[in-house]
Curated annotation (Swiss-Prot):
Catalytic activity, reaction form: (S)-malate + a quinone = a quinol + oxaloacetate
InterPro entries registered for this protein in UniProt: FAD/NAD-bd_sf (IPR036188), MQO (IPR006231)
Enzyme class: oxidoreductase
Pathway the protein takes part in: Carbohydrate metabolism; tricarboxylic acid cycle; oxaloacetate from (S)-malate (quinone route): step 1/1
Keywords: FAD, Flavoprotein, Oxidoreductase, Tricarboxylic acid cycle
EC annotation from Swiss-Prot or TrEMBL: 1.1.5.4
SUPFAM superfamilies noted in UniProt: FAD/NAD(P)-binding domain
Record protein name field: Probable malate:quinone oxidoreductase 2
Example of a GO biological process term: tricarboxylic acid cycle
Matching Pfam families: Mqo (PF06039)
GO molecular function, one term: 2-hydroxyglutarate dehydrogenase activity
HAMAP family xref list: MQO
Organism name: Staphylococcus aureus (strain MW2)
Protein family per UniProt: Belongs to the MQO family.
Amino acid sequence: MAKSNSKDIVLIGAGVLSTTFGSMLKEIEPDWNIHVYERLDRPAIESSNERNNAGTGHAALCELNYTVLQPDGSIDIEKAKVINEEFEISKQFWGHLVKSGSIENPRGFINPLPHISYVRGKNNVKFLKDRYEAMKAFPMFDNIEYTEDIEVMKKWIPLMMKGREDNPGIMAASKIDEGTDVNFGELTRKMAKSIEAHPNATVQFNHEVVDFEQLSNGQWEVTVKNRLTGEKFKQVTDYVFIGAGGGAIPLLQKTGIPESKHLGGFPISGQFLACTNPQVIEQHDAKVYGKEPPGTPPMTVPHLDTRYIDGQRTLLFGPFANVGPKFLKNGSNLDLFKSVKTYNITTLLAAAVKNLPLIKYSFDQVIMTKEGCMNHLRTFYPEARNEDWQLYTAGKRVQVIKDTPEHGKGFIQFGTEVVNSQDHTVIALLGESPGASTSVSVALEVLERNFPEYKTEWAPKIKKMIPSYGESLIEDEKLMRKIRKQTSKDLELGYYEN
C-alpha cells in the first residue's frame, strides 16, 4: 500500500473498541478521515453499556481464573501479570485523554474500589493462600493482603459475613485496595463525543453497514443503510475496522476474505441479580470474585460487585448464562443460523462435540429460576432476601469458535481476538472478556499488526499518549510504580499519594 498524507478508514460500531481505536487514530494521524457507523441511535448501547457488561476494571487483582494451579502444586501468575500491565496501559491512555482535554471528569467513568477474592473449602483456601504468596513476591502485586480471620473479613466484606457467625466454615479472602470500577458506557460516550468533535471525523447513528466490495485498487466500497429512511449509500475507504461486538462475525463473513472462513460464534447472554435495596447496597464496597465451578469456563466466575452507574452506587451478582440465537441484544433471532455457512459448519459441529459439558452447563443455567439464582447469591451473602433483588439480562457475548493447528477443529477461543485480511485492509475484533479493560492494548495490537509502515513515525506519538509504550511494566518495577502514581493523579483515583 502506497503511503500518502491522508487515508480513509471506516469504523463499524460505536462501542468501546471502535471509539478507543478512533480516539487513538485521530491523535496519531489527525489528517486521516474517520467514518464511524453505528446501527443504533447512540453509542455504547450493546456490550459496552454499563448495564450490559459483566465485571469491569479487570486488572487480575481478584479474578482467580488468571492465576492457574499447576500439576506440581505451584501457581502460575504469568497471565495475571499480562492482564495487569494491559490495564495499566489503558489507564495511561485514559489519563492522556483527560489531560489533553479530549474527555472530562474522569470520576464519571472510573472510581477507586477494593478488589477482593473470596473462597470457601479446604482446597480453595489452600489455592488462595498459595496464590497470595506467589503474587506477594512480585512487585506488581506486593500490596496484596490475605486473611482467614472472620473478624478481619467482617471489616473487608461485612455484608457477606452476616449470618455466618454460628458456622463460618473454612474460608479465606485476599484484598488489594488499589482496584477500580470502570463505567465503560460512560467512557465510550465520552470518546465518541470527542471523535465527533474532530474536524476529519463523522459519527453517524442509525446507520448500518450491510455490504462490502473490494475494488481493483485495493480499496473497499462499503454499503451503508440509513435505518430511519431506508436509503443506502456507498463509502469508499482504504481500511475497514469491524468493532461491532457480537455483530462482528456476520460482518466479517460479508467481506468474503479468506480469514473469515472456518470461524463461527456461540452467543451467550449474561444475567445478573441487581440489588434494589439502598440499605443493602451501602453495606458492600468492593468487587468480590469467587472461584468458578469445576469444569466451567472463565465466564462463570461468580462475583458480587459494587458498580457506579449514573453516578449512583449499585450492587450486582452473577453472572448466570442465558443462551439464545441473537448475536446482539438488539439483534435478530436468525443471527446464529445466518452465520452457519458451508465453510464453517464442520467447525461448529466439532465445537459442539468437544464442549458437551459447556453445553450442559449453559442449558442448566437457562432453566434456572430466580430462586436458583438467589441460592447461588446466598453462598456469598447468606441473608439475601428475594424482594431485594431483581434478575435482569445483560449484553451478549459471542464466543469465537475456530480451527487451529494446535487444538484442531472447533476450538472455543476465550478472550479478544484480532482477525485481519492478508493485505491488512480489513481488521475485525472478535470475542469478549477482558476486552473492555484491555481495549487500549487491543488497539495497539491492531496498529502494530496492520500498519507496520507507520511504526517509526507513530512510535513517538504513541509514547506521548502511553509513556510505557515499548517498555515492560512487568520487568521494570521503577517504571511501573512511576506510571501507577501518575495515572492515579491523572484519573483522580487518590492512590499512591504518600
